[in-house]
Amino acid sequence: HGVEYFFLSPEEFRQRIADGEFLEYEEVYPDRFYGTLKAQVERQLEAGQHVIFDVDVVGGCNIKEYYGNRALSIFIQPPSIEELRHRLEGRGTDTPEVIQQRLDKAEYELSFSPKFDKIIVNDDLETAKAETLEVIKHFLSIAKNSIKQNLLHSK
């Protein structure tokens, strides 16, 4: 899927943060960073590629702030916290403590949803996938028309 990983030492990662080279980043554990380099994204965009990110809410807000209306931000949320609890408990893979941590994080993340362009409620997976696809298609058609208009006006 065109995913490339670059492994940097914690010191080099911190230096690149200080130099403003990251579009978004997060220190997920002490000295364990993940992030997206601006230069890599720009190379992909210049090559005519569409770039899709699966990032946390802060990363999503940072990307949207950087690219403005050249980016589409989608927030996918559960129908409710109670439904999320039910789903997590139904998996039978996490302890009650881990489930509570995930629910607390979900509540925190939900507070960011108004900052996104589109909120999709994942009540039914197939419906949510179809709605997401339609939102993306609509956004890309608007972007394509905008590029055409810019070309016409530049002549």
Please identify what each model-predicted range represents:
Residues R43-A47, E65-N69, S111-S113:
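Conserved catalytic network of the ASCE P-loop NTPase/AAA+ motor domain
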Residues D56-V57, D124:
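Short glycine-/small-residue-rich Rossmann-like dinucleotide-binding loops
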Residues F6, L72-I74, K118-I120:
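Hydrophobic/aromatic beta-strand patches that form the interior of the parallel beta-sheet core
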Residues P96-E107:
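Glycine-rich S-adenosyl-L-methionine
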Residues V51-D56, Y66-G90:
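Conserved phosphate-donor/acceptor-positioning beta-strand/loop module used by diverse small-molecule
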Residues F13, I52, A106, I120:
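Residue-level signature of catalytic and energy-coupling elements of molecular machines
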Residues G90-D94, Y108-K155:
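NTP-dependent small-molecule kinase module
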Residues H1-V51, V58-C61:
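ATP-dependent small-molecule kinase phosphotransfer cores
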